[in-house]
Amino acid sequence: MQKLKFYLNHEASGGILIIIATILALICQNMILTDFYNHFLRIESGIIFGEYKIIKPIILWVNDGLMAVFFFFIGLEVKKEILIGELSSPKKVALPVIGGIGGVVIPALLFLAVNFGDEFARRGWAITTVSDTAFAVGILLLLGSKVPSSLKIFLLLLAIIDDICAVVIVAFFYTSELSNFAIFMAGIGILIFLVLNILKVNKISFFIAAGSFLWVSFLESGIHSTIAGIVASFFIPLKPIKGYCMLDDVKHKLEGFITYLIMPIFAFVNAGIALNSDAFSNLLHPVSIGIILGLLIGKPFGVFIFSYVAIKFKLCSLPTGSNFKQFLGLGFLTGIGASMSLFIDSIAFMDSDQFAYADKLAILIASFLAAFIGWRILKTSGNKNENFETIKEAETTNSTAEKIEDIDENKN
């Protein structure tokens, strides 16, 4: 339980930093720092190795580079959970998987229904299928004991399923024209990882070199470079070699870096939306409507309805000490797309300003409303199970007291 509390607090702190970074980006874009902010995002830098060079603006170094590290971290979590964690038990994973599927299918269908006639707009169908776990966890912590621990654990498991879906979506649906040579080089990179595992190498530097080579190969291949992070993570050894567990060590070292640096930086460079008349007038564009409907209705009710049906058909059970009203509130928290939706938006529309930033504005509006509604439902859920753990503890104490009284009576 202490480990869970630490993780939740860690995630919540990251959520606060993302909020601050988002507010700073909005201030920079809409006040006297507009020119500086836009110039900063487009400053080019790169890596030159002989005749080969990679030159990119800062915003793309963040979206293609730092986010690859983020997905690498996600991959480490997924690998550990699948092999020895909560996802290794079919019984425990059933409800998050079913809820996660609903949280992807329903919002995607809603978005496509609104944007069916526009081929370019349809590229954004996945924007509403992801969640920002840091924000959601932050809301849960604000509610304290009103939300049972079992529901918090469910949210974290659902977040892992959500991340897996995001990886699959990016890998299969957001690839540009493929380069056979670069894909071949990526294959060599994977082969290097295999050799490192076969030889049981436990030096991080070798894996960093192999990962960098793999990232460059993916970058040039047409497959989004963040997938290189996921692929590399699957080759980080979980089994200790000479008493050293590389996966745990790397995951521990990256945790703070991801939470306190990468995600806030990502929010800062991507959330700078021009809050002008064009952005607000374009909120009636089908893309904006699809995003709002997907995050505010599709995501929450997708998670809730799929889970509700599974529970009613006894395929799985409701998290201990919770009820369906709380579960609906949790569903709304999954509608907080925020940074993850902004990420999918950036690769779906290739940072195009065709919608005058109304797409990004819709993400922020829908995320805020989903957070408020979810918080409100959970806050007012006042149910019999609200203090489940306290009641259970009290019952145990009373039972113990009764046993002591019985012993005393027998002595007398």
Curated annotation (Swiss-Prot):
List locations, semicolon-separated: Cell inner membrane
Task: Give the UniProt entry's GO cellular component terms.
Answer: plasma membrane
Segments spanning the bilayer are 14-34, 58-78, 93-113, 124-144, 153-173, 181-201, 204-224, 254-274, 291-311, 327-347, 355-375
What is the disulfide pattern of this chain?
none
**Keyword line:** Antiport, Cell inner membrane, Cell membrane, Ion transport, Membrane, Sodium, Sodium transport, Transmembrane, Transmembrane helix, Transport
| One example of a Gene Ontology biological process annotation | regulation of pH
Cross-referenced Pfam families, in alphabetical order? Na_H_antiport_1
Statement: the UniProt record of this protein carries the keyword Transmembrane: yes
InterPro entries associated with the record? Na/H_antiporter_dom_sf, NhaA
HAMAP family from the UniProt entry: NhaA
The entry's family comment says: Belongs to the NhaA Na(+)/H(+) (TC 2.A.33) antiporter family.
Please give the name of this protein. Na(+)/H(+) antiporter NhaA 2
Question: Which species?
Answer: Campylobacter hominis (strain ATCC BAA-381 / DSM 21671 / CCUG 45161 / LMG 19568 / NCTC 13146 / CH001A)
